[in-house]
Each structure stands twice: as structure tokens, then as C-alpha cells.
């Protein structure tokens, strides 16, 4: 018997190299959707992405999650064109996570008076309807004419609209450069998932929330009020509901225009409106607010950063019968004006520096708007005695 095992195996014709190559897709259109989407996500330049989507309708459809993740409308007809596209692709709205809408009122005015406008004079409804279709929207930035204010405000009333919203910026342009009525968008403060809110050039009177409208606790962490005319009682009302507001900034021009009607005269009124248990950073860059008495801030148990003017902190009443009550863990004190223009304030600040370990032991950084050679002598001497260095900026 032969020592070798012989097994007869039927021979198959070898597959030609040409046949193997033919099995491999030669075009992008031959790739599966999942792989196409991976390729599209790797495109770094927007123009490359757009060019790729012009290759075919399939490419355009596959790229929807990337194309519509973040969009911007800078002309009125853009959002109307997008609104029409939702008729054939209703799920497209749910792909959007960030939207920025910014166009001048003059453009909207011209567009609304076009004879063949698809919405006649009712541009507000399709606009708000388009935004409401974005069920996964997280970031909303609005800078549009005041005529759209009420329509957009309705988005914050519904329990299901914008359910994932995390940050929002609202600015409605008035023809006379005036303040828009925040009451029309007041429900934005009741949004349960909103964490960061910026309001620009708005006015709010003492009404705040009506009794039936008041929300439950919200997640608002950061609030910026830019060039606003806000009543202090209304501010107190709308800040009752954020469970853990961490940061607030209130800024205004040196000479507000139009003149203020609702804002208080004294900085104390705004300070009293703020939540004491949670806030960590306060910025009040509002030159026209006066300081009646020295601020008492000891109850602000979490406050670490304070940006303010010296006359607002130490007060302008004379004689000054009370000293500043600094927060227990305040670390950064930033003066937004040149300190020491008032001699009495300069002496009070010098006393604070000399006795920092007693009256403000947690302060590790004090920033002033002065130049280094522009400090009052009494403050220079106090810094030298206590070996404390100011920062200039």
C-alpha cells in the first residue's frame, strides 16, 4: 500500500482577477448608505461636503444628518424654502441640533410685501412652524425683526416644542432701535431643559409671570441680559424657578438708548433679585446704576466672582455707615472702572486690602481698570503693607 493518501478533489477554474475587481464597487454610488455616511462625516471643508452632495440625489439624501445638523438662515426666503422641503422630507427637521437665524428687518419688510409671496403677509406662521419641527434642537440663536416676536414666543408655550433645547439667544430688531417686549417671550424662562439664555435689548415691566403661568423648577444655569430694561421685581420673579443658576451678567451702555423706564436706580435692587444659594458669578456692567449703600453680600454663600464698579460696591451715600459685607468664598473681585476717583472709596478699598485676612480672606485676585502708574497713593501703600498685588486690565 502506498504511504501517501490520495484524495481526488474536483478542480475549479481559478477566478480571474478581472472578475474579482468587477465585484468591487467602482463609484461612491455603489457603496452602502452606512459607509457613504462615514465618508461624508470625514469631509473637513463645508464646500467639499456640498460638492459631494451635488453628485446625486442619493448622496444628498444620505448626507442629511450631516448637512442639517447645524444650519443658518441669513435671508427670509431661506427658511421658507426649508419649510417647503419638510413637505417631502418631514423627518429632516428632527436632524437639526443648532440653528442661527439672522437677517435685517429691511430684508424681511421687502420680502413680506412681494406680490407673489407664498405666505402673503403671514411670514410669522411658517417661520415658527419650521422651528417647531426641529424636535431635537439644542441651540437656538434668533436675531430677526420684531414682527416675528410673538410667533416665536409661542414655541416656548407648548409642552412638546423644542423639548431638547439647551441654549437660546433672543434679539428682535425694532425699527426705532427700541426695546422689544420680553413679555411676548416670557415663557422661555419656564423651559425645563434650557441651561443658557441670552436676552438682548428687551424690556420687561413689573408683571413678570402671571400667576397661572409660573413654571416649576428649571435647569437654567447661565443668564445674560444685554442692553435690557428689566424691572427688578420682574427679575426676582423669573429667577425664582431656576434651581441652580450659576452665572448672571447684566450689561448696559453708559448712556442707554432709548432711555430706561423699568430698570431700578440702584444696584442693590438687582442684587436683591438674585438667588443667594447657588450663584457663583455676578457681572453688573451698568454704569448708570448708582450705589446707595455698601453692598451686603454675605448671604451669597456660593459667589466666587464679582465684577462691578467701585461706587456700586462701596455705595455713594455719605456718611457711609456700613462696610461691605463680602461673600464668604469670594475669590475674584473685578472693578470695571478706574478705582479711587472718589477719595473716600479709595480709603475704604485700602482698608479692605490691609485687612483682607479679616474682611475678605478668600480673595486671591483683585482686578482694576487703572494703569499701574495710575493708582491712588493710599491704595499703593496698602498693597505694599499687606504684600498684596493688584492686577491691571
Language model features by range: what are they?
Residues 25-121, 149-151:
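Hydrophobic regular-secondary-structure patch
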Residues 5, 39, 288-393:
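Leucine-rich solenoid repeat modules
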